[in-house]
UniProtKB/Swiss-Prot annotation:
Source superkingdom: Bacteria
Top EC class for this record: transferase
Assigned EC number: 2.4.2.1, 2.4.2.2
Keyword presence, Glycosyltransferase: yes
Keywords of this entry: Glycosyltransferase, Transferase
Encoding gene, per UniProt annotation: ppnP
CDD domains recorded: cupin_PpnP-like
Protein name listed in UniProt: Pyrimidine/purine nucleoside phosphorylase
Amino acid sequence: MTDSIAATINTRANVYFDGKCVSHGITLADGTKKSVGVILPATLTFNTGAPEVMETVAGSCSIKLAGSDSWQSYGPGERFDVPGQSSFEIKVEGEPYHYICHFG
């Protein structure tokens, strides 16, 4: 999938968890911030500052929000919300998980 947008892209990658998650920050013309990235097979815990909407582009994942005991699964075209000042666990198995993270 290819989208054409007016944006500034941080060409230096954000690399987390020994390379298991790699993303690039994007700032749209209106100031909206996003990141586009990939998570390799692993189970990882992320902390949030601002609220996030995670949009699945390819692959699949299971997530467990802070305070929850249950895992929810998401595939291509699906999204999940993560509250600000919180955390979530994400489990990726098999194929890499490609995402767009919408901040705020």
